[in-house]
């Protein structure tokens, strides 16, 4: 039985190695050999030429500030919380 399981493991390992060596990885926008197409490279360069600055509309900025406001109130007025003493006074 031990020899049978050993043969099965060797066949599985061989199948895995063959599958990995024969498979070709194709990523979106890449050609075989890891080369990019020229058209996609030009589009990427043009996109980077804009500076990459994205401004949020005023409405979105107001919504973000509204969501963060309760946290600012808690942080500013935290003096009413008493710290618990870890060790009693003797």
From Swiss-Prot:
GO molecular function terms noted in the UniProt entry: gonadotropin hormone-releasing hormone activity; gonadotropin-releasing hormone receptor binding
Pfam families recorded: GnRH
Subcellular location: Secreted
Modified residues (Glycine amide): 33
Tissue spec. comment: Expressed only in the terminal nerve nucleus of the telencephalon.
Entry-linked InterPro entries: GnRH (IPR002012), Gonadoliberin (IPR019792)
Keywords: Amidation, Cleavage on pair of basic residues, Hormone, Pyrrolidone carboxylic acid, Secreted, Signal
Modified residues (Pyrrolidone carboxylic acid): 24
Signal peptide: 1-23
Record's keyword annotation contains Repeat: no
GO CC terms: extracellular space
Record-stated family: Belongs to the GnRH family.
Protein name: Progonadoliberin-3
Lineage of source species: Eukaryota, Metazoa, Chordata, Craniata, Vertebrata
């Amino acid at each position: 039985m031990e020899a049978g399981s050993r043969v099965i493991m060797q066949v599985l390992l061989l199948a895995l190695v063959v599958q990995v060596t024969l498979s070709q990885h194709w990523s979106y926008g890449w050609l075989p050999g890891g080369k990019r197409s020229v058209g996609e490279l030009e589009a990427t360069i043009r996109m980077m030429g804009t500076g990459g600055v994205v401004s949020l509309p005023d409405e979105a900025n107001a919504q973000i500030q509204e969501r963060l406001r309760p946290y600012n109130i808690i942080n500013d007025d935290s003096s009413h919380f008493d710290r618990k003493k870890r060790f009693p006074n003797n």
